[in-house]
């Protein structure tokens, strides 16, 4: 009987289950969207129970579509939207509040207080992160401070915290396993990425009891088995990585200096810096790429908050396209952007600016500006933001990138990928298997149970689907990019109630 690896890819807008065979090919896939809650401006929430229900739904769907039995699954890998914070009752398993999503900005004032106390450098030295509402630490504090009875229960050891990986494993094991991996822990702003442990000083500063926290383990090992009553069989859960780190692993960026960019709701570029963490001087994050076989690989990361979400905005709010795929058609209907720039700073700007008070703007409009110009400028904004990050990355690492590996939904947009290559001046490579995030989690799980023999075997499985090479003249590239920099300045520091 053939064996497979099940990958759970729990994202910001949907839950997905992908089943891979030994060649790393997708055998079956299922996806289900779930609700986004926006209780106040700048607030973004998910219902953890809906995340769980959709996850179980897509697993059943993927198994049925592939005609695969539970007994044919060798291991389960989990990859997840990072930073998103769930706190639940240890006895009942019931969340005390909706999950606070990574995009949520409600804790900006808590972050401002940390900065006023002069803690920015301390936090950066310990965690590799900026002080920002993006990360889990201040979200945990907010829930404990604002949900009635939560702090008392936490102090009594009756609550549990987890990022989404932790929540799903808790549920899959019927409350037996409370665990996360290095990559997810490295996104909480309370985990010391050098000592590889929760940081007591930061927990004290944010008033977070340590009894809340999961055990932190490598990204590839058996954490426990699924509960037979919950899952239908006892199957090892053997791989965990935050979505961007999983994509890095799935793109087999195992060598120092290799980089990938994932085009999803946001855009995330990671460069493997090997076993040596590089502290950024240019607005990037130092993060853990993966931990495997007793070693930890670090990465520099540029987190861009809004890329694919800007395309959703064109579709859902402005209603000027019917689907994301339409953007390529409209973008090619005009010869250039017509001087129009869209800065999609809907929730502020991430790397390398870290401006929580920036807001979205469209500049350069004239009477001749058309729908096609706005669509094209929105796509171009994704490529410009990626260049912002790459310039910072090259400055920090001293490594000149030759090729960027790409994945995610928008990586299938050929117009965008060609423009990306043009504006960076480097080659852009798209793999045959675009499901690199899920593939990375599958690889981590498969390695832990001996389904694959080692990373060398995985290197041989990576295959290129398309190569985009720069075709734009240098002066044109720099002229367009200079326009983008001017547009960003217009968007910055827009919100005044600081």
Curated annotation (Swiss-Prot):
The keyword Nucleotide-binding applies. Glycerol binds at residues 82-83, 134, 243-244. Its EC number is 2.7.1.30. Transmembrane segments: none annotated. GO terms for biological process: glycerol catabolic process; glycerol metabolic process; glycerol-3-phosphate metabolic process. Pfam families: FGGY_C, FGGY_N. It comes from the Bacteria. GO terms for molecular function: ATP binding; glycerol kinase activity. Sn-glycerol 3-phosphate binds at residues 12, 82-83, 134, 243. It catalyses: glycerol + ATP = sn-glycerol 3-phosphate + ADP + H(+). Inhibited by fructose 1,6-bisphosphate (FBP). It is an enzyme of class 2 (transferase). ATP binds at residues 12-14, 265, 308, 312, 409. Keywords: ATP-binding, Glycerol metabolism, Kinase, Nucleotide-binding, Transferase. Gene3D superfamilies: 3.30.420.40. Pathway: Polyol metabolism; glycerol degradation via glycerol kinase pathway; sn-glycerol 3-phosphate from glycerol: step 1/1. ADP binds at residues 12, 16, 265, 308, 409, 413. HAMAP family: Glycerol_kin (MF_00186). Key enzyme in the regulation of glycerol uptake and metabolism. Catalyzes the phosphorylation of glycerol to yield sn-glycerol 3-phosphate. This is Glycerol kinase.
């Amino acid at each position: 009987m053939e064996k497979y690896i099940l990958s759970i890819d729990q994202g910001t807008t949907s839950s997905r289950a992908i089943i891979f065979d030994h060649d790393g090919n997708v055998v079956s896939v299922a996806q289900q969207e779930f609700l986004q809650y926006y209780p106040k401006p700048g607030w973004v929430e998910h219902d953890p129970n809906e995340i769980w229900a959709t996850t179980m739904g897509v697993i059943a769907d993927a198994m049925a579509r592939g005609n695969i039995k539970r007994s044919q699954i060798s291991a389960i890998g989990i990859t997840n939207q990072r930073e998103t914070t769930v706190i639940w009752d240890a006895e009942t398993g019931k969340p005390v509040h909706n999950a606070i999503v990574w995009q949520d900005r409600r804790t900006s004032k808590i972050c401002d207080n940390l900065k006023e106390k002069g803690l920015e450098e301390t936090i950066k030295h310990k965690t590799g992160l900026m002080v920002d509402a993006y990360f889990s630490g201040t979200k945990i504090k907010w829930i404990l401070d604002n949900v009635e009875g939560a702090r008392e229960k936490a102090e009594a050891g009756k609550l549990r915290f987890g990022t989404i990986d932790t929540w799903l494993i808790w549920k899959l094991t019927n409350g037996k396993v409370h665990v996360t991996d290095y990559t997810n822990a490295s996104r909480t702003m309370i985990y010391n990425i050098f000592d590889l442990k929760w940081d007591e000083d930061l927990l004290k500063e944010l008033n977070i009891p340590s009894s809340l926290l999961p055990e932190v383990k490598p990204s590839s090992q058996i954490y426990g088995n699924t509960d037979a009553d919950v899952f239908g069989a006892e199957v090892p859960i053997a791989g965990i990585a935050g979505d961007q780190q999983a994509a890095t692993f799935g793109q087999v960026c195992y060598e120092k200096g290799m980089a990938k960019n994932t085009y999803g709701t946001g855009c995330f570029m990671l460069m493997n810096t090997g076993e040596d963490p590089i502290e950024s001087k240019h607005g990037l994050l130092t993060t853990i790429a993966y931990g495997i076989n007793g070693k930890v690989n670090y990465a520099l990361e540029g987190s861009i908050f809004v890329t694919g979400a800007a395309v959703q905005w064109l579709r859902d709010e402005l209603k000027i396209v019917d689907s994301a795929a339409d953007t390529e058609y409209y973008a090619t209907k005009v010869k250039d952007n017509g001087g129009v720039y869209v800065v999609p700073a809907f929730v502020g700007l991430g790397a390398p600016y870290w401006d929580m008070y920036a807001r979205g703007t469209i500049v350069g409009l004239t009477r001749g500006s058309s729908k096609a110009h706005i669509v094209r400028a929105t796509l171009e904004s994704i490529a410009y933001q990626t260049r912002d990050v790459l310039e910072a990355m090259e400055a920090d690492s001293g490594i000149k990138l030759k090729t960027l590996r790409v994945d995610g939904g928008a990586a299938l947009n050929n117009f965008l990928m060609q423009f990306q290559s043009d504006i960076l001046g480097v080659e852009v490579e798209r793999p045959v298997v675009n499901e690199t995030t899920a593939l990375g989690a599958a690889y981590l799980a498969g390695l832990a149970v001996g389904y694959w023999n080692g990373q060398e075997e995985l290197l041989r499985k990576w295959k290129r689907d398309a190569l985009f090479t720069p075709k734009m003249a240098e002066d044109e590239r720099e002229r367009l990019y200079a326009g983008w920099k001017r547009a960003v300045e217009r968007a910055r520091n827009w919100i005044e109630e600081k």
